[in-house]
């Protein structure tokens, strides 16, 4: 970070330092200060832990120097930052493993269908003819019948907006088929392009099957390999994950070539289709389509996968990390308006998790949610906190009503334990809402966004079945309306599922059982009405309507009492990410402002010892581009190059002027070598390079021919 010394000559050709923009969410602290209590002015208490074991056993507070305190604070900073980083890795690892299990569980049904289809197709091909190994090795097809030249092909409709969500699915499908006794080969859209041709495509297929690919890649090499005893009784499955992006001519030529050998070499296709099942008809010719024997399979819709993911990672407390109402609404809008992919939603959630652990000083306590003895874990961690962080914990906005600070440690542990218990009941009630909303095609993500709204929790609100609560309960009210029109059989099944979700909530479970018994009696009355229609009355219909209203009123009452948002609970800031502005700027992006902010506050990211002591002042030890960006803040939309250079020259030469004015030190101290002042040509070269880097990053527009002495600023707003 220091300016290059004068004893080594510098030129732009020999010393071009790389230009780094290190962004670590520095703007997060300032933007989140409005929602969290401010820490001591040193700014270091938010990353301190108990390091009493590192201190001297007999400290003398009267003789400790400031340098020793600063060194100890630096060590505390690194230890505490490492603790939060470890907590993030552990929490996100749990979330990621849950995501993988959910997606694989959804895909297993499709995998079983594909495997069953492969086995049936292989049996059908073998029933036509079973050539011997010698016949397979013969360099010509075995049969010429048209019926025997059709390749069994499974078209898998994924319904995804982007192919990025299909990558994991087809990768797992290939592993699943290979583990169940199939020879596997994967062909990408790049290999099936006009640029590569069918020869490159077939060579790629051979490389995945044969251990030694001959120089001349032809179908006879594949036939010779398949005639071996260890390969003969297993089908060959070729997976093409993105059919729409392939070249129709290349794929058609491959189909025509392999179809001639389908009896000798049982090769089957599995092709992924993202749009509609008419895609093969648009891509391949009629002659090519006649060589395929299609089978249509469908993967679960993106909405089903999204509902399963939201239930596993946001509704159920799987890792101790949650998001606020504003963040949930932003993620939902980002999913629907950006590209509609599960991958983008997961990436945004991971970014929110990382921002939470980088901003919140006490976020490392989230790990306690994963511990079996979580209360002892929280007690130990709280006892290790310094006094500043204890005050910070008791001063959280959600805890400002707590008057007693003498037992703040117990209050925090009890508060986090109560938060977990309330969240468990919250998730149970939310799942009951979703089970009822399925009959009205209500998505779980929409209900979730309403359930995390802190304004929704009105425990003493009037419980009127026909009264709407406003737009904040739009989807929840839609669920209530759906319940009122459900038939008795569906209502009984719904109550059965509710009793499973509400396990552990005894009072609510008893009410559900009462409604179940009422449902059974109502159903028996309906059967009696069907047997003796003349003796029945209209009271049966009225009782059914009353029963539906009772179920809706029960769910509405449970919702108002137990659907408590996490933002209404004490200490929720520790586990809940609320700063949507950070997430919005990171995902939607404002790159010029972020680059400018990183340059102006470079010392916060680089953490060098020379610039850290005076973080506000512009020092010569800073990078030239950072110095120039700081000086540019003093100008308007245009900057005079001459004035800018004079300011830059003054900063650079301030080091040498301080050395000249430095008083003589004691003779006992070792004399340092004098630092020679830099030449004006070198300062001009450094100035020009810094201006060029600011132009490359998009912060400046270079001088025009009319005003060559002025440059124009592009980025503002700091």
Swiss-Prot record:
Primary location group: nucleus
GO annotation terms (biological process): DNA replication initiation; lateral root development; response to sucrose
GO molecular function terms listed in the Swiss-Prot or TrEMBL record: DNA replication origin binding
CDD domains in the cross-refs: Orc3 (cd20704)
Subcellular location: Nucleus
Tissues/organs with expression: Expressed at low levels in the shoot apical meristem (SAM), leaves, ears and roots (including root tips).
Motif Nuclear localization signal positions after renumbering to this chain: 659-666
GO CC terms, sorted: DNA replication preinitiation complex; nuclear origin of replication recognition complex; nuclear pre-replicative complex
Regions annotated as coiled coil: none
Induction: Reduced expression upon sucrose depletion-mediated cell proliferation arrest, and accumulates after sucrose treatment.
Record field: compositional bias (Low complexity): 26-43
InterPro entries noted in UniProt: ORC3 (IPR020795), ORC3_N (IPR045667), ORC_WH_C (IPR040855)
Keywords carried by this UniProt record: DNA replication, DNA-binding, Nucleus
Function: Component of the origin recognition complex (ORC) that binds origins of replication. DNA-binding is ATP-dependent. The specific DNA sequences that define origins of replication have not been identified yet.
Family: Belongs to the ORC3 family.
Oligomer status and interactors: Component of the origin recognition complex (ORC) composed of at least ORC1, ORC2, ORC3, ORC4, ORC5 and ORC6. ORC is regulated in a cell-cycle and development dependent manner. It is sequentially assembled at the exit from anaphase of mitosis and disassembled as cells enter S phase.
This protein's name: Origin of replication complex subunit 3
Lineage: Eukaryota, Viridiplantae, Streptophyta, Embryophyta, Tracheophyta
């Amino acid at each position: 970070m220091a300016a290059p010394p004068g004893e080594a000559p510098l030129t732009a050709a020999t010393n071009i330092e790389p230009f780094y923009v290190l962004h670590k969410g520095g703007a997060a602290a300032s933007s989140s200060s409005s929602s969290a209590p401010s820490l001591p002015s040193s700014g270091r208490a938010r990353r301190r832990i108990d390091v009493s074991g590192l201190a001297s056993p007999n400290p003398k507070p009267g003789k400790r120097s400031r340098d020793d305190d600063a060194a100890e604070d630096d060590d505390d900073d690194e230890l505490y930052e490492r603790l939060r980083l470890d907590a993030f890795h552990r929490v996100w690892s749990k979330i990621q493993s849950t995501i993988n299990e959910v997606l694989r569980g959804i895909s297993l049904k499709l995998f079983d269908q594909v495997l069953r289809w492969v086995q049936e197709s292989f049996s059908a091909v073998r029933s036509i003819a079973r050539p011997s190994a010698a016949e397979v090795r013969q360099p010509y097809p075995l049969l010429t019948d048209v019926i025997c030249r059709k390749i069994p092909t499974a078209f898998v409709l994924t319904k995804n907006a982007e192919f990025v969500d299909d990558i994991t699915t087809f990768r797992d499908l290939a592993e699943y088929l290979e583990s169940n006794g199939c020879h596997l080969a994967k062909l990408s859209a790049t290999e099936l392009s006009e640029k590569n041709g069918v020869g490159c495509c077939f060579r790629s297929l051979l490389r995945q099957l044969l251990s030694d690919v001959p120089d001349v890649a032809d179908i006879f090499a594949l036939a010779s390999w398949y005639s071996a005893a260890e390969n003969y009784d297993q089908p060959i499955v070729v997976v093409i994950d993105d059919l729409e992006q392939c070249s129709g001519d290349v794929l058609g030529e491959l189909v025509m070539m392999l179809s001639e050998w389908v009896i000798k070499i049982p090769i089957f296709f599995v092709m992924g289709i993202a749009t509609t099942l008419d895609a093969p008809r648009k891509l391949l010719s009629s002659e090519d389509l006649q060589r395929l024997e299609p089978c249509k399979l469908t993967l679960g819709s993106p909405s089903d996968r999204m509902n399963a993911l939201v239930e596993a990672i946001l509704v159920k407390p799987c890792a101790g990390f949650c998001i606020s109402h504003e963040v949930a609404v932003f993620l939902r809008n980002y999913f629907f308006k950006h590209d509609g992919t599960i991958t983008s939603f997961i990436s945004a959630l991971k970014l929110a998790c990382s921002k939470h652990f980088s901003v919140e000083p006490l976020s490392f306590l989230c790990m306690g949610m994963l511990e079996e003895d979580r209360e002892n874990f929280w007690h130990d961690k709280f006892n290790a906190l310094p006094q500043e962080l204890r005050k910070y914990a008791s001063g959280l906005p959600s805890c400002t009503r707590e008057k007693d600070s003498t037992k703040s440690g117990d209050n925090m542990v009890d508060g986090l334990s109560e938060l977990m218990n309330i969240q468990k009941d919250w998730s149970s009630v939310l799942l009951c809402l979703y089970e009822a909303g399925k009959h009205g095609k209500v998505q779980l993500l929409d209900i979730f966004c309403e359930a995390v709204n802190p304004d929704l929790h009105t425990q003493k609100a009037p419980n009127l079945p026909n009264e709407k609560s406003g737009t904040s309960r739009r989807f929840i009210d839609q669920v209530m309306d759906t319940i009122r029109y459900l038939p008795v059989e569906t209502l009984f099944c719904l109550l059965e599922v509710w009793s499973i979700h509400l396990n552990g909530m005894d009072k609510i479970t008893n009410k559900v059982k009462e409604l179940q018994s009422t449902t059974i009696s109502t159903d028996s009355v309906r059967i009696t009405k069907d047997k003796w229609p003349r003796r029945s009355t209209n009271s049966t219909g009225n009782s059914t309507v009353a029963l539906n209203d009772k179920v809706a009123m029960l769910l509405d009452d449970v919702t108002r009492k137990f659907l408590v948002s996490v933002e209404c609970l004490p200490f929720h800031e520790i586990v809940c990410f609320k700063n949507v502005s950070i997430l919005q700027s990171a995902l939607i992006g404002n790159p010029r402002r972020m680059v400018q902010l990183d340059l102006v506050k470079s010392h916060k990211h680089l953490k060098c010892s020379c610039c850290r002591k005076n973080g506000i002042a512009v020092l010569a030890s800073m990078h030239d581009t950072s110095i120039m960006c700081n000086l540019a803040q003093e100008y308007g939309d245009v900057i005079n190059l001459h004035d800018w250079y004079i300011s830059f020259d003054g900063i650079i030469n301030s080091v040498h002027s301080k050395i000249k004015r430095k008083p003589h030190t004691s003779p006992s101290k070792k004399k340092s070598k004098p630092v020679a002042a830099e030449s004006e040509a070198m300062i001009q070269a450094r100035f020009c390079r810094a201006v060029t880097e600011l132009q490359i990053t998009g912060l400046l527009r270079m001088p025009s021919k009319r005003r060559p002495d002025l440059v124009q600023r592009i980025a503002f707003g700091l």
